């Protein structure tokens, strides 16, 4: 189980609810808009992120259920997303899986055993933010719509042009 804190944990509507405003990392800021964004407010921002991973989805769901039960009356679930399967290649012996559009996804991901690359691109280094963030990381989540039925009607050559690589 991984926990992440959104900007609202530090300061929300100008109120320092938990005495943490002075500990907010400068880098924790709203993302700029992307061309074609159709973001929905109910799936945007938030104070706390919980990611529960398991080889058995029932274990992950049960963990989140227990946490939400404990937090009843103090916190509520704004939105949840169930995931499935390995969605990226993280070790040299893994094959790159295909996404729902049929394209390999994650081929260029940083490998879990490449400590230098992880230190450079994933983990917060000493001096790159508040001391409590050293060794931590940032998470960005964007819900996207994958219109598979529409995609399946697009010619292969056009799909490859859109994605920027061959299938």
Residue ranges and their predicted role:
Residues 1-167:
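Long, histidine/aromatic-enriched segments associated with O2/redox biology
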């Amino acid at each position: 189980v991984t926990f992440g804190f959104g900007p609202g944990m530090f300061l929300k509507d100008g109120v320092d609810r938990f005495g943490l405003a002075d500990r907010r990392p400068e880098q924790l800021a709203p993302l700029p808009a992307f061309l074609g964004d159709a973001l929905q407010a109910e799936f945007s921002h938030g104070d706390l992120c919980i990611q529960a991973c398991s080889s058995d989805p029932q274990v992950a769901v049960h963990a989140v259920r227990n946490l939400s039960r404990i937090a009843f009356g103090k916190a509520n679930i704004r939105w949840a997303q169930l995931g499935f399967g390995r969605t990226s290649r993280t070790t040299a012996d893994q094959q790159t899986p295909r996404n729902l559009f049929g394209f390999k996804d994650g081929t260029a991901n940083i490998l879990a055993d490449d400590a230098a690359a992880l230190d450079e691109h994933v983990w917060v280094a000493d001096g790159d933010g508040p001391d409590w963030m050293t060794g931590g990381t940032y998470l960005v989540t964007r819900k996207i719509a994958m219109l598979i039925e529409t995609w399946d009607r697009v010619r292969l050559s056009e799909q490859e042009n859109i994605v920027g690589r061959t299938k």
